[in-house]
Amino acid sequence: MRNVPVVARGDQFVFGQNLEDVAEFVGLQGGTGHTPLPPEQLIGKWLNVLRTAQRYLRQMPDARLNELVIDNRPRSIRLMGHHVFRIGEAYLETAVDGVEYATQLANVPPKDGTFTTGEEIARYGDTVIARLEKWWKELPDKSCQQKVKTFFGMQPLHLLYERSTWHSAQHTRQLAAVLERFNITPDKPLTKEDLAGLPLPERLWE
């Protein structure tokens, strides 16, 4: 069963993944009030986030990669680091290959015995960054209004693009918090300006 938020009213419902759909469903005039960043700004922010995650992972002690990110979540630092970049790969599978986007698509874990060092995970990031750069350079319609198939219906590519960007950013913020817990100062941390315009959760561990 998919773990997906749903807003229901009688026998009607809407998936909670698209907050504008939710706002319309409940009759909120003017929607959420959030204006997504233009696609040409998102690519720069996303690539900066991924490069920041690479720096953080290269700082992470390899001997601690299998520790939990936080005590009450069953995800190791290794899996979190891999996930930051897997989000980008999953996005491309939908945007380029036409695979239906689903939550589990971005949660495909690395095989046992792989990605055992921060450096190895960071190098995986190199391949994802290169693919994203190539995708953007070759994208014919940079408005990103073309529709893609997701588990919550056909959606504009722009929505999934923005979602994937802030999703990577949120986990990168969490990696910085892990470094700080280890008394390691994050290398060139993300700034408020880097994250401006992204609809990030208010709390770090949401």
State each model region's role.
Residues N3, A8-G33:
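Non-catalytic, surface beta->alpha helical segment in thiol-disulfide oxidoreductase systems
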Residues N66-K111, K147-E206:
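Short, contiguous alpha-helical
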